[in-house]
């Protein structure tokens, strides 16, 4: 179903992300004592009673400073208010009312979104009542004392949130979205790509490395199906990142790869494939995720009729972990081929989830054996591949039964995988091949049993 949105609004370091984690029972939002950790608007699933909703966390609002990302953070907050059913405005009860809180109240009055005022860091009921009183002057309604860390008052606050949500019968059914993670090194254009796809300023774009720190979820409809796009923090070598918000953002990025159906690995056309790109490619293959390689900033290169072919060959020679992944040359700046990402990603997901019957698998293996026999030992012992069967999908995984797995070296194993790909496809998806030793008569009996069951 289409879920209503609850926006979290407030100045820096009042505990917005802590409250998001409390409301959503997760630790997805990055919490750190450094102000300005959250920059883009990030979405999580919230639940209370029999209702489901989206909680959108926004960056800390500052109105007396236009340095760095602060104007963009204000724009992100305004976009969140446009789609929200209610805005939860968070203030710091221990610090008391500030001029920044008053500026935020003025900002909210220019939007039509209903508001609920939460006074955070009220660690006891007596404290809460005393602290909340001065916030009536903001004109945002009754102040609700809460403790985001300990959970005090959050149940009552959520009861109030539900009164602003549309009735359940106004929420329609929705298909489970495809999870697509947009990953890459810092500053390769991931956020620009996300904005080009969505047609709006969904993520803050800046030449400063590390602009995106959270993983940013965006829901969108493409190819007649729902997608959830995750723009991740730029992933660098861990020893180059200090312990802090960016460190946690990188960990979130690795988790985004793990929970994705398909990864879009963004490569900078100007830089080519770096050592870190290779590490990311290896991570995607290791986690068994479908993948599309997107070469961004294609508009910035001088080209002739052979440039794309030559560059793809060069890039693939270095991205050997992902030789099965389709490659697309795009420009987030001009929008060139951006929409084609979805068609390739949808095909990769389809192949990633695909299953093939045992009989079809063995037709391919039989042909592979006819072209190239298994290796023979110096003593004259012949390797034998009895049969194969698909045992799993996501990624497609096959068990191959042989007389002795040790006789099948890496070269022949790669040959068999290539033949499976040529015969069965699986473009955009990694494969897993498991080689198992078995006596010939047992293998023949098992294969006959499988075929009789399917017949």
From Swiss-Prot:
Q: Which Pfam families match?
A: KH_dom-like, MMR_HSR1
* Record keywords: GTP-binding, Nucleotide-binding, Repeat, Ribosome biogenesis
Per the database record, which ranges form the EngA-type G domain?
4-169, 178-353
Give one GO term, molecular function aspect. Answer: ATP hydrolysis activity
Checking HAMAP family in the record gives: GTPase_Der (MF_00195)
Q: What does this protein do?
A: GTPase that plays an essential role in the late steps of ribosome biogenesis.
Please state what the protein is called: GTPase Der
Say which species the protein is native to. Answer: Synechococcus sp. (strain CC9605)
């Amino acid at each position: 179903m289409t879920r209503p949105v609850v926006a979290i609004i407030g100045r820096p370091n009042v505990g917005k992300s802590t409250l998001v984690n409390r409301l959503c029972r997760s630790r997805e939002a990055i919490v750190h004592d450094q102000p300005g950790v959250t920059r883009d608007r990030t979405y999580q699933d919230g639940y209370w009673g029999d209702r489901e909703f989206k909680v959108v966390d926004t960056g800390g609002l500052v109105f007396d400073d236009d340095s760095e990302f602060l104007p963009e953070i204000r724009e992100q907050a305004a976009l969140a208010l446009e789609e929200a059913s209610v805005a939860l405005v968070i203030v710091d009860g221990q610090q008391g009312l500030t001029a920044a809180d008053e500026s935020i109240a003025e900002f909210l009055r220019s939007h039509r979104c209903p508001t609920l005022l939460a006074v955070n860091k009220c660690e006891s009921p007596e404290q809460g009542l005393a602290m909340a009183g001065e916030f009536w002057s903001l004109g945002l309604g009754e102040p609700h004392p809460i403790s985001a860390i300990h959970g005090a008052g959050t149940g009552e606050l959520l009861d109030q949130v539900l009164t602003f949500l549309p009735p359940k019968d106004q929420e329609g059914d929705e298909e489970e979205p495809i999870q697509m993670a947009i990953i890459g090194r810092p500053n390769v254009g991931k956020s620009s790509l996300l904005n080009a796809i969505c047609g709006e300023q969904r993520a803050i774009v800046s030449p400063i490395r590390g602009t995106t720190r959270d993983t940013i979820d965006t829901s969108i409809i493409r190819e007649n199906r729902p997608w959830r796009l995750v723009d991740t923090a730029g992933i660098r070598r861990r020893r180059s990142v200090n312990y802090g918000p960016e460190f946690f953002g990188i960990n979130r990025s690795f988790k985004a790869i793990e929970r994705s159906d398909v990864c879009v690995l963004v490569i900078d056309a100007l830089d080519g494939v770096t050592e870190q790109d290779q590490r990311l490619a290896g991570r995607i293959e290791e986690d068994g995720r479908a993948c599309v390689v997107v070469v961004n900033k294609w508009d910035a290169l001088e080209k002739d009729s052979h440039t794309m072919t030559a560059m793809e060959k060069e890039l693939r020679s270095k991205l050997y972990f992902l030789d099965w992944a389709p490659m697309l040359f795009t420009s987030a700046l001009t929008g060139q081929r951006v929409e084609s990402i979805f068609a390739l990603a949808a095909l990769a997901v389809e192949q990633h989830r695909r299953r093939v019957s045992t009989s079809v698998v063995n037709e391919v293996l039989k042909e592979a054996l006819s072209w190239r026999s298994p290796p023979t030992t110096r003593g004259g012992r012949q390797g034998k591949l009895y049969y194969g069967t698909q045992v799993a999908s996501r990624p497609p995984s096959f068990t191959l039964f042989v007389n002795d797995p040790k006789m099948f070296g890496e070269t022949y194993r790669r040959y068999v995988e290539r033949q499976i790909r040529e015969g069965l496809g699986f473009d955009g998806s990694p494969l897993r091949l498991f080689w198992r030793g078995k006596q010939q008569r047992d293998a023949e009996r098992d294969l006959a049993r499988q075929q009789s069951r399917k017949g």
